[in-house]
Amino acid sequence: MNVVDASVLVEYLAGGEHEAAATHAIGRERWAWAPALVDAEVGNALRRLVRAEKITARKAGAALDDLLLMRLQRVPHRHLVERAWQLRDSVSFYDGLYVALAETVDAPLVTLDKKLASASGLRTEVELIAPA
């Protein structure tokens, strides 16, 4: 099982250019790890897509419904904060929470974020499924 960041979930749920790669990362069982903040991040990204007229509000609503039905293991981020802060010079605090979770559960972090995938000081495998 992988840790997936919001970029992968948005691509999977909204049917972006790299949907097939995102689907493969999540797997047939639609099971993955993510920090609990993932719902807010995905919701905000879908909002941006609607405002940019890249997807319809109806499609975004359906994507949010699908997100809530996924077998996503949402992990409270309270115990991830310290490690995320230690990574502040390499990645954003949000990304640090995903990295800290991947390190904690000893699973690869899957992302579409090239900058995150090339960050230094991470103690986990980061798999870039497509450059963003």
Residue ranges of predicted features:
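Acidic, PIN/NYN-like endoribonuclease modules and their adjacent C-terminal/linker elements
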Residues: 1, 99-132
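Alpha-helix C-capping/helix-to-loop hinge sites
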Residues: 28-32, 49-52, 67-70, 87, ...
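Active-site-proximal, substrate-binding regions of enzyme catalytic domains
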Residues: 45-71, 83
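Active-site neighborhoods of divalent-metal-dependent phosphate/nucleic-acid chemistry enzymes
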Residues: 70-115
